[in-house]
Design a protein with these regions (language model features):
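Bacterial Sec-dependent N-terminal signal peptides
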Residues: 1-25
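Extended soluble regions of mature proteins
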Residues: 18-238
Length: 238
């Protein structure tokens, strides 16, 4: 299953060598309120050294690297493999925080208007294929430089989905019966800000964002930032 998306993409690329590239992204989660060790229910009598170690581990766990491989009509987005964490020296404090396992590859075909995502459910691997719709981006008359590229701003309003509303309602019902240690915030509409460059004429970007007149180099969500650190292009034969 893990080879399916790669095979789809490589096969197509063999017929579309005129323009392709790779964009490397770095993402990090933004924490609105400082999360403390005692919030996890571990121990309320925490010394400053452990609190500092926890904050550093939390920061590292929220940072991930991704690779977007693309041509003019397709792209594949995947999380890069993380290096094994070095073992702590004897006597040093070490805290590890993990949010989730490695994410599956995401493949988009702009011609077919479909997206394919690898996912694992109950230990079995699945390939989920869904139709894609072009987001209703609002282009903003504002620009800035990201590396060597001139980028332009765009905004996207993402309303709360019915699924999110239902999940929150179910959480509230469970809270009435048995309060949970972890709280769920009420979902709200959110505004996504993107920075794209027409200098790279593809309509793709990180994390399934697409539909702008140029490669997306930066995404700002309320609690997540995705930045492009490097772009490698191969336009031989164009």
């Amino acid at each position: 299953m893990k080879k399916i998306l790669l095979l789809l993409f490589v096969t197509t690329f063999s017929f579309a060598q005129e323009f392709q590239g790779k964009a490397y992204y770095f993402s990090k989660t933004i924490f609105n309120d400082k999360i403390k060790v005692e919030d996890t229910g571990v121990n309320k009598d925490i010394d400053p050294a452990m609190e500092k170690a926890f904050q550093e581990a939390l920061k590292k766990a929220s940072e991930k690297n991704y690779l977007l491989t693309f041509n003019k009509s397709e792209c594949i987005y995947e999380q890069e493999q993380q290096l094994e964490k070095p073992k702590s020296v004897a006597g040093e404090m070490s805290i590890s925080v993990s949010f989730s396992s490695s994410e599956g590859k995401k493949y988009i075909n702009a011609k077919d208007k479909t997206s394919s995502t690898e996912d694992e459910i109950f230990g079995k691997e699945f390939l989920i294929v869904e139709p894609i719709e072009k987001p209703n981006w609002e282009l903003v008359d504002e620009s800035k430089k990201i590396g060597d590229y001139t980028c332009f701003k765009a905004k996207l309003l993402v309303p709360v989905s019915e699924k999110q509303k239902k999940e929150y309602e179910e959480f509230l019902k469970k809270e009435e019966i048995k309060p949970s240690l972890f709280k769920m915030e009420e979902p709200k509409d959110k505004t996504i800000t993107a920075w794209y460059t027409p200098e790279i004429p593809v309509s793709f970007g990180p994390n399934n964002y697409l539909g702008l007149p140029g490669l997306i180099l930066e995404i700002n969500e309320p609690e997540l930032i995705i930045l492009c650190s490097k772009v490698v292009l191969n336009t031989k034969g164009a």
